[in-house]
Amino acid sequence: DTGYARVPLVCQSCIYDLGFGSASVRPDAAMGYEACEDAKANHPRSGNTGAGCGATVGKLCGMERASKSGLGIYAVRLGRLEMAAVVVVNALGDIFDPESGKKIAGLRSEDGSGFADTREELYKLSKRTDMFTGNTTIGAVITNGKFSKAEMNKIASMTRNAYARCINPVGTLADGDTIYAASVGDVEADINVAGTLAAQVMERAIANAIHAL
């Protein structure tokens, strides 16, 4: 029992979005099938789509001061090496564009006229506080590079640098961040190149989750 509704503990990873909208609205098998058909027929979309429909950020002071977020996708090719990233940005912290450094989503000011600083608000907490824990940024990188399981684990670890560059604060006890990495090809590539590229692609995917709204 989550306080909003009861949820089955059967999935590998999911974002907690029952506090956004109605907790009684649930996807079913027909909706899943329709989503797959739509994904085959159309180009991948970022923003308020798929798992990003219930995503929010900047929730330190509650949902009433949070910002809408979404699903982000980005992909690049470096020579023969291809790298793609997909991420659902559902974080406690604020979101920053990796190129401009500008805050693009996060905790809103009390009067709603702009953004507050989640980090500064966090520093004001003088004692242990029960924060809202329904924050989980879930991402995945997929490459055609040929890597072992251990090497893909390292690439996933390097990809997490994107979270640190785009989300602040990040990795708190109120966040349940996850990154998956998968190889679907046989292109020979250097692991350091792949890991660095994966982080860069994930940065752009995080930004797209906001810019595409």
Q: Predicted regions span which residues?
A:
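A structural signal for small-residue-enriched, beta-sheet-centric alpha/beta enzyme cores
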Residues: D1-L213
